Regions:
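Short, hydrophobic alpha-helical segments
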Residues: 58, 120-124, 182, 248, ...
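Signal peptide-proximal N-terminal region
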Residues: 23-40, 154-156
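Short, low-complexity disordered leader/linker segments with a strong preference
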Residues: 1-5, 58, 80-87, 298
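Hinge/beta->alpha junction and helix N-cap segments in small-molecule ligand-binding domains
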Residues: 9-23, 38-49, 71-72, 94, ...
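Immediate post-signal peptide segment of exported/extracytoplasmic ligand-binding proteins
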Residues: 1-6, 30, 124-127
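Hinge/cleft segment of the Venus flytrap/periplasmic-binding protein
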Residues: 1-2, 133, 137-140, 152-153, ...
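Hydrophobic alpha-helical
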Residues: 58, 64-83, 149, 162-163, ...
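Flexible loop/hinge segments that line or gate small-molecule binding clefts
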Residues: 72-111, 119-123, 129, 135, ...
Length: 298
């Protein structure tokens, strides 16, 4: 079988990580002889729009769907509708809370949260007042990364965590939230951020306030790599949405072609800092989604 049509869902067009996921899906489709249809809410992370997009996708009768819910609990009925239509689903990035799916593709958000938090705490010498900003409240990635941040902090007696309001995984929101937080918080020794986009907003707020603090992020986006290169950002984690989106799309294609697909595919991550950023120092368009055999063991 060839020429399969895969409906690929992403949450928004404002977070570059989802640009990367779409690029990964497109790369894999091109080399597999499949076709991708993208479904993206016009309003970022909008539940109502995604519900409507699911109905549009079902009506288009794709061979499979690659699906990330904008909210893991609010799309249960939509996933049931996809299941009832007999369309195979590959779940990626945010694990579904209900429904049937061929496989889940992602990374261990809890572990990466623990690891990058410990990296920051070591940098601070094991003590300090650390601000923490989560992303979209309904996103599993944010919830698990924050849980990892907090569990890591419990292992460092000298670390105190100060939680800010969520930055919704948006740079403008994160900048506004951090500016308000800084206005009432005289001491911030470091900042944990659940993604790179928010980290960039946090850095802007710190700089506008004439203050300095080491900041970490997640995603290894080109803008974050540039900030590491210049010394503005301490570190990030290569939670690679391009790889995840690409492998999820390939999982859908392989399933349709009768090939075996693992029930879960968890891709490894690593911390990116001044010592190793060169491997990621290129635009998204010049990055490559690895082959299935490089990442998936059956």
């Amino acid at each position: 079988m060839a020429g399969e049509t895969i409906a690929v869902f992403t949450k928004n067009r404002t977070n570059p990580a989802y640009d990367a996921a779409r690029m990964g899906a497109d790369q894999v489709a091109a080399r597999s002889g499949a076709r991708v249809l993208h479904f993206v809410p016009g309003k970022p992370d909008d539940i109502t729009e995604q519900v409507a997009l699911v109905e549009q996708a079902i009506a288009a009768r794709p061979d499979a769907m690659v699906f990330v819910p904008v909210d893991v609990n609010a799309l249960d009925a939509s996933v049931s509708r996809i299941n009832a239509a007999g369309i195979p689903v590959v779940n990626y990035l945010n694990r579904l809370s209900a429904g049937r799916f061929v496989t889940y593709v992602g990374s261990d958000d809890y572990r990466l949260g623990r690891d990058i938090a410990a990296y920051l705490f070591r940098h601070l010498g094991g003590k300090g007042e650390v601000a923490m900003m989560g992303g979209v409240p309904g996103a599993v990635t944010s919830r698990e990364r924050v849980r990892g941040f907090l569990d890591s902090a419990r292992e460092w007696r000298g670390i105190s965590i100060m939680e800010t309001p969520p930055g919704d995984y948006q740079e403008v929101t994160a900048r506004r939230v951090m500016a308000s937080f800084l206005a009432t918080t005289p001491r911030v020794d470091g900042v944990l951020s659940a993604n790179d986009v928010m980290s960039l907003g946090i850095l802007s707020a710190l700089e506008a306030a004439g203050r300095r603090a080491p900041v970490i992020g997640v995603n290894a986006l080109p803008e974050a790599i540039a900030a590491i290169k210049s010394g503005r950002l301490l570190a990030t984690v290569d939670f690679d949405a391009m790889k995840i989106g690409g492998i999820a799309t390939e999982a859908a294609v392989r399933h349709l072609r009768g090939e075996r697909v693992p029930e879960e595919i968890i891709l490894p991550v690593q911390i990116v800092d001044q010592s190793n950023f060169a491997s990621w120092d290129r635009p998204l368009g010049q990055r490559r989604c690895p082959a299935w055999s490089e990442l998936v063991v059956i």
